[in-house]
Amino acid sequence: MTGALLALCLLIVATSPLAWDTDRMSLSAQIRGPKAVAGLKALLPVLTASAATDELARLQNINEFFNRRIVFRDDIEVWGQADYWASPLEMLDKGEGDCEDFAIGKYFSLLLSGVPVQKLRLVYVRAQLGGPEGPSQAHMVLAYYAQPGAEPLILDNLITEVRPASRRPDLSPVFSFNGEGLWQGTGSQNSGDPVARLSRWRDVLAKARAEGFQP
């Protein structure tokens, strides 16, 4: 993609009511290379269009964007590490990611589209594969709460449809967190500062801020 096209895309976003640090996003993408630039170019119109819709439509649009654009790969294949949490631009640059990367990309994108942080939580779960008798594995999803205490809607790289938690009996929450708190399961009892207790979350927050994805 040419620099002129990216500049036009960023100009459209910068003049929207939910403008963010487009200069930093553009520079960060250009430093990473053409794949990151192309990924940002594809994402920005989705964010801009989603910001003009209701929150349910934002969930659906952004969930579908990442599920269609990003190929699932384990961290060891993508990064040569057993567990690596990628920033949004890192994932867009690779075009690949695991469940944490999908959830993190959706989290920051929904924040940029205007969804309040209080409505979003990244949730570590045990996912039952292949039915009740199948094996379980560690997994991460993004949960959206329309109101405090409401049943959350689940955004998952395994299923493109956004479903209420009651329709995901295969998921057993372990703990959840966002930029403001850490909770056991999906409960309301705050268990502390997630930045202090989750070193990978601290790292990805810093990277997202450097890229312009985090205020």
Task: Locate each region found by the language model.
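Bacterial N-terminal signal peptides
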Residues: 3-13
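A structural boundary/capping signal
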Residues: 15-215
